Amino acid sequence: MNEKNLKPASVFYYFEEICKVPRPSKREEKIIAYLKAFGREHGLETKTDEVGNVLIKKPATPGKENLKTVILQSHIDMVCEKNSDVEHDFLIDPIETVVDGEWLKAKGTTLGADNGIGVATELAILAATDIEHGPLECLFTVDEETGLTGAFALKPGFMTGDILINLDSEDEGELFIGCAGGANTTAEFTYQPVSAPQDYFYFRVAVKGLNIFYIYVRLMAETCIMPYLVRHRHYVRYL
């Protein structure tokens, strides 16, 4: 990745750095070690809890000591998926990135910007010497993608801040003040396969490195087959 052309430069510098560190969900030990080393190198108070959450504190700049303490939070794990024709071991291999026009992409794998860009933003702020701020606490939680176990394991007193800003969002310039939450549902049922009618229309959609549902909807819209599918109850098989 040529981070020199990406802005803010410090954010993308640290994003490139953490792309070199494997961080699958539930296997975050290498990125935890990286964060602890970062804290030591910058002379910042750093601690971890029993599940691996990391907290790095940065004192206020002179004259800002009386401001409320702000917590910045992001998760350090990433979704690890790759194209079938790509050789990649997420436990040892770095993420290879490439700038494609206005997009930063990974070569045949997930990029890990969720939530690596949040982690990189926090590291850039912690390393900065030209930003005025009150007391800061940067919280890095584990295992968001497969259960939120890091967030659920947080205990009173681990952080002391008054305001928490979560950096795991979609777009810049938007601030969420609440959410609908989430839930897990487990269902059990008896599955009995049946033969599909011979006069039905079948097709298979194969897409690499893209959102299959987004592409499928666009395909239906552009080929005008949505009304046909609705009228004739055609089967769709996802790969």
Predicted regions and their residues:
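Flexible, glycine/charged-enriched surface loops at secondary-structure junctions
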Residues: 47-49, 135, 237-239
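Active-site metal-coordination/substrate-binding segment of hydrolases
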Residues: 64-140, 145, 151-162
